[in-house]
């Protein structure tokens, strides 16, 4: 994908993975609009890369359309939309209803709402690219965090549906599925999340590097941690064996926290 003068929007780009992707895109010649709930953070990254900053709340139905509309005009149209905003919510069935709803709104419905705004124009033009930051949790699971795991699976499923439905009509859909990344989200993932993910955690810049490679080759799954492909294959090959392995991992983590 030639990014020269390409209009791109990156959500959740005030820091972490989103900011790193925005910097890489701008460095490759794209015209980038930085979107974040934190208006100051969005403006700071935008000023750094010579782009535009548009605040927006990916957790609300009214929060997605305005940034898409505001970004589209100065960019001359959005050719690449990076749905990166996400939220980590821990716990299991006992997690409060509000936590489950927040995870659903940010991790899933923000993608749906962005697609609702963008797809008609992309179909009319015959091209567009929709890239979502999912997580390896969407391919596997995340111990200690049912809302996060469930909504990331749903985000991946929506990406698969989008690709199957629109892939032959000019719309490329890609899902980025890293394991641990050294961001605020990792720090807030709780003792279980940190114990599992920290040993193999990579930087946001390494994720952005993988994204740039993925944009060039167009693959659906972008895996900054290559070992995720083996874990995903093992899960599909023998799900019961894989689940038994996850239970053993959970037991080791709990022993370490005792």
Describe the role of every protein-language-model region.
Residues 135:
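Residue(s) in the substrate-gating loop at a strand-loop-helix junction
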Residues 115, 151:
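Active-site helix of classical SDR
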Residues 39-40, 55-68, 97:
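The beta1-alpha1 cofactor-binding region of Rossmann-like NAD(H)/NADP(H)-dependent oxidoreductases
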Residues 175, 191-231:
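C-terminal helical subdomain
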Residues 65, 87-101, 124, 144-147:
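Conserved mid-core segment of classical short-chain dehydrogenase/reductases
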Residues 7, 14-15:
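Conserved glycine-rich cofactor-binding loop
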Residues 28, 140, 161-172:
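Active-site-adjacent segment of SDR/Rossmann-fold oxidoreductases
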């Amino acid at each position: 994908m030639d990014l020269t003068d390409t209009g791109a929007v990156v959500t959740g780009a005030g820091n972490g993975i989103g900011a790193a992707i925005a910097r890489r895109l701008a460095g490759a010649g794209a015209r980038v609009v930085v979107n974040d709930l934190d208006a100051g953070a969005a403006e700071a990254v935008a000023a750094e890369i010579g782009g535009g900053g548009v605040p927006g709340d990916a957790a609300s139905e009214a929060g997605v359309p305005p940034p898409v509309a505001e970004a589209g005009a100065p960019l001359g149209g959005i050719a690449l939309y990076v749905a990166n905003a996400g939220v980590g919510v821990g716990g299991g069935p006992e997690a409060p209803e509000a936590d489950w709803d927040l995870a659903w709104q940010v991790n899933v419905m923000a993608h749906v709402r962005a697609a609702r705004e963008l797809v008609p124009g992309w179909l009319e033009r015959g091209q567009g690219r929709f890239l979502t930051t999912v997580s390896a949790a969407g391919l596997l699971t995340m111990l200690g965090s049912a809302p996060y795991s469930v909504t990331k699976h749903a985000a991946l499923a929506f990406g698969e549906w989008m690709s199957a439905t629109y892939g032959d009509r000019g719309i490329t859909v890609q899902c980025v599925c890293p394991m641990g990344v050294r961001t605020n989200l990792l720090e807030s993932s709780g003792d279980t999340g940190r114990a599992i993910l920290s040993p193999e955690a990579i930087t946001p810049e390494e994720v952005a590097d993988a994204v740039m490679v993925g944009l060039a080759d167009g693959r659906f799954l972008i895996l900054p941690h290559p070992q995720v492909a083996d874990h995903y294959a093992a899960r599909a090959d023998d799900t019961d064996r894989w689940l038994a392995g996850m239970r053993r991992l959970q037991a080791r983590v709990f022993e370490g926290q005792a």
